[in-house]
Amino acid sequence: MKKIIEKEQLLDMLKNIDKNERLDLRNCIFKDMDLSELDLRNVDLDWSDFENVKLANVDFENSNLSNVFLEHADLSNASFKNCTLHATNLRYTDLTNVDLSGADIFGANLEESKMDGIKTDENTKHYKMVCPETGAFLAWKTCFNTRLVRLLIPADARRTSSTLNTCRCDKAKVLAVTDPTETVKFDEAVSYVDGDFVYKVGEMAYAKGFNPDRWRDSTGGIHFFMTKEEALGYLMSISGEQSESATDWTESK
């Protein structure tokens, strides 16, 4: 059960904490308060919720904000240097001029956020697109009946990815459809999402309603992975099977 933390209580914690220690604020609720310009460096906020909290200019450097609920928050000019933001809910937030240098935002939800002036560096993880921004390349996906699909994403295809390893494009050529070991070949494969969407070997597949917004992950487009291993990992996760045969799939090249 989450614990409600009042502002004065939080300020006392910050005042009394040893600067060499990491303040544990996991599974807490912060509600209806102004924390603007507060020093929240080196704090563990895993699974905490911020509801109607002003957080502009807050310094979160070296903190863990994984799984934190920040929807609609004003985080303008905040520092997330070297922070972990795995699966953080940042929908509808104001991230204007936020510093993400060295931050890891894997799985963070950035839908409908204001992102003008965001600062990143070479150590920022999962902010850049996973797939090549230009040119043609090979990709992989899985379909019904444990079928593995190898795709060619053409140079003129629109492509995008959010903060996960999944990518999307508006069109692709189907190079091969096989079983997970690539020993049994098929002529076609049926999409998980749309039973009428069929990938046919040698033909182009065109997405219905491709959404160019890169921060929307579950939306229109042909979804794919950059590696066979990632595609097979996804296949195992949705099937819920950790069988020996599944292990063999990932080991086969």
Regions inferred by a protein language model and the residue ranges of each:
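Tandem repeat scaffolds
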Residues: M1-T146, R159
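Short, low-complexity, polar/charged sequence segments that are solvent-exposed and flexible
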Residues: V43-L45, R168-A172, E241-S245
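Glycine-rich loops and low-complexity Gly/Arg-rich segments
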Residues: S48-F50, L175-V177, D248-T250
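Non-catalytic interaction/regulatory modules that flank or connect domains
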Residues: V130-G221
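Charge-dense polyanion-binding interfaces
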Residues: S239-K253
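Short, glycine/acidic-enriched capping/hinge loops at junctions between secondary-structure elements
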Residues: L38, S162-L164, L235
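Extended catalytic/binding region for NAD+/ADP-ribose chemistry, centered on the ART fold
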Residues: R214-L235
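Alpha-helix boundary/capping residues
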Residues: I17, S237-S239
